[in-house]
Amino acid sequence: MFDPNAPVEVVTLRDERASEGDAIGRVIVAAFAGEPQGGQFERRIVDTLRADGALSVSLVAERDGRLIGHVAFSPVSIGGEPSGSQRWYGLAPLAVLPDCQRRSIGAGLVRTGLDALRRLGARGCVLLGDPAYYARFGFAPSGDIVFPGVPPEYFLALSLDDSAPRPSGDVRYQDVFHPV
């Protein structure tokens, strides 16, 4: 039942600021704390993308002056073409503080990020993730765009420009995603 006297939670979604790298890193580490590297790999991805100028879209969720979520998008290469030349991007990582999850904050970051990609003239986006979660945004498994070594049902694609030809082949993310 709706309670008109319940407090309203205001969350602002916006571009990251140059001074927020450490705070974003803390959000990422907390969100991925249960992963094998405790979120340090995901944090290094974002820090390196930022340092390399390859962080095409980087959004934060803020509540009461505190960062509670983050999403990053960077150019990918498909079928051996130069990175970014096809205007396709990879979404990774998406992070929301554990105590703020299941409140549509991640969904808001994804939707806002996809809108930002469209404004950049992006043709599509790929990600490795849960098909049940990402289907709500239009992502689906794609047999023609593949990420080698990953079960195809978890590698998802979304065309953002249906007038452009859809590329096919193996996807390569920025080098930081592929540790040696």
Language-model regions, residue ranges each:
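Conserved acetyl-CoA-binding loop-helix of GNAT-fold acetyltransferases
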Residues: 91, 96, 102-115, 127
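A conserved beta-turn-beta hairpin within the catalytic core of GNAT-like acetyltransferases
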Residues: 76-91, 101
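Terminal substrate-recognition subdomain of acyl/acetyltransferases
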Residues: 1-9, 131, 135-180
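Conserved glycine-rich acetyl-CoA-binding loop
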Residues: 66, 97-108, 120, 136-137
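Conserved GNAT acetyl-CoA-binding A-motif
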Residues: 114-129, 142
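A short beta-loop-alpha structural element at the N-terminal edge
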Residues: 10-24
